[in-house]
Design a protein with these regions (language model features):
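Phosphate-binding glycine-rich loops of NTP-binding sites
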Residues: 15-18, 79-92, 119, 125, ...
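Flexible glycine-/small-residue-rich
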Residues: 28-32, 60-62, 87-89, 151, ...
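Short pre-catalytic strand/loop immediately N-terminal to key active-site residues, enriched for Gly-Thr
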Residues: 44-47, 68-75
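GG-anchored amphipathic helix commonly corresponding to the ABC/SMC/Rad50 NBD signature/C-loop
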Residues: 57-58, 62-64, 78-100
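Conserved D-loop-proximal element of ABC-family nucleotide-binding domains
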Residues: 69, 94-95, 107-115
Length: 224
């Protein structure tokens, strides 16, 4: 576990840097509890459970100079979502959770970083269902399905309406996200380009995944 923890720390730090969190420190803290009736390890009696005798906790510092704190105590929703995305990107195939929800993962980011976030979400979605609430056109363009959420007031009551967008509606919505309220020819062209680029990126992800699976199968056959 300690050897794997060191590898995980490096991988998570690299992923977070790509997600625009270059100053973040990530640490895997492994401790144990003493117990007189426990198992003797290196001259000490250690409490042993069905999960082993290690207590494993993820610690993180999101700003320079701040002490490491338990990941569970991170306040910012956007930071928490990106940290979880970094972990899920690394553990995607080993994690058995069928559905993952990322809320406001675009907080405080834009441009190239938002594009990277969208691409990583797309990779995670190859092994899990991913639901992402976002205001970022870069992230929205990477989705396989796009829903628009609106609030409407009718007869003095507020309703939330969720609508699945078709291709043309999606272009218009991405155009609005890119340019504000007004949809122009330029924003529509940009929106189409983003969707076409997203299709190519996802096609490459699928091709790379198939190549990796084929290589893994080949290695197993050679080992046999």
């Amino acid at each position: 576990r300690k050897e794997t923890a060191c590898l995980l720390e490096k991988e998570v730090s690299r992923e977070l840097s790509e997600l625009g969190m270059k100053s973040v420190k990530f640490c895997v803290n492994i401790t144990f509890d003493q117990d007189e009736s426990g198992i003797a390890v290196n001259g000490e009696n250690i409490k042993f459970t069905k999960d082993g005798f290690d207590n494993v906790e993820f610690l993180i510092s999101t700003n320079p100079g701040e002490p490491l704190k338990p990941l569970a105590k991170i306040v910012s929703g956007g930071e928490s979502s990106r940290i979880m995305l970094a972990l899920k990107s690394i553990l995607a195939k080993a994690d058995m959770i069928p559905c993952m929800i990322f809320d406001e993962i675009d907080t405080g980011i834009g441009g190239r970083t938002a594009q990277v976030v969208g691409e990583k979400l797309s990779k995670v979605a190859m092994n899990h269902q991913v639901i992402c609430v976002t205001h970022s056109p870069q992230i929205a363009s990477m989705g396989d399905v796009h829903y628009l959420i609106k609030k409407l007031v009718k007869d003095g009551r507020t309703y939330t309406v969720v609508t699945e967008l078709n291709e043309e509606e999606r272009i218009n919505e991405l155009s609005r996200m890119l340019g504000g309220v007004e949809i122009t020819e330029n924003t529509q062209i940009h929106a189409r380009e983003m969707l076409n680029m997203a299709k190519e990126i996802k096609k490459n992800h699928l091709s790379m995944s198939k190549d990796l699976n084929a290589f893994t199968t080949f290695k197993k056959e050679i080992s046999i």
